[in-house]
Amino acid sequence: MAQVEEKIQVKEALDLIEEVFDNLEDLVFNVEEKVRHNPNIPYLYDFIDSLYKVVGTTKSIIEYIMDNIQPQDIYSTLDFYRSWLAYIQRLLYANLKDLNMTENVMGTVTYIIANLYKSFREFKKNNENRQNKVEGIVLNPNTPIPTREL
């Protein structure tokens, strides 16, 4: 019974991360397109600050899941995403100081988030396929996107 309950928790947690990643990707793509053509948009600081907070929220959700869901095999993959989100936070924070970097930083952030989200969807799909094939909880994550691809 506890395994079934935990399996449901893991699925709900992964669904939540996917939803936040999806929203984050949409937000970045929509604004990055505008920023590319006009780096002096008055609300740019507010946007970057909002994006910084959304990335932080996503990272916090991942940390909460890692702290509260027991299967050990999921940790390495979630830690991978948490690490990249921390990197994006630092990149965005540095960008708040220099509007001239906006175009390059937004392009980099967009690329990283798109690849993280694609990798996360694959991980989630593989995890669900394993759970459907095997009774009980099996959480051997796939290999996330290699760093060199970023």
Swiss-Prot record:
Q: Which domain of life is it from?
A: Viruses
Entry protein name: Uncharacterized protein ORF150a
Give the species.
Acidianus bottle-shaped virus (isolate Italy/Pozzuoli)
Q: Which taxonomic lineage is given here? A: Viruses, Viruses incertae sedis, Ampullaviridae, Bottigliavirus, Bottigliavirus ABV
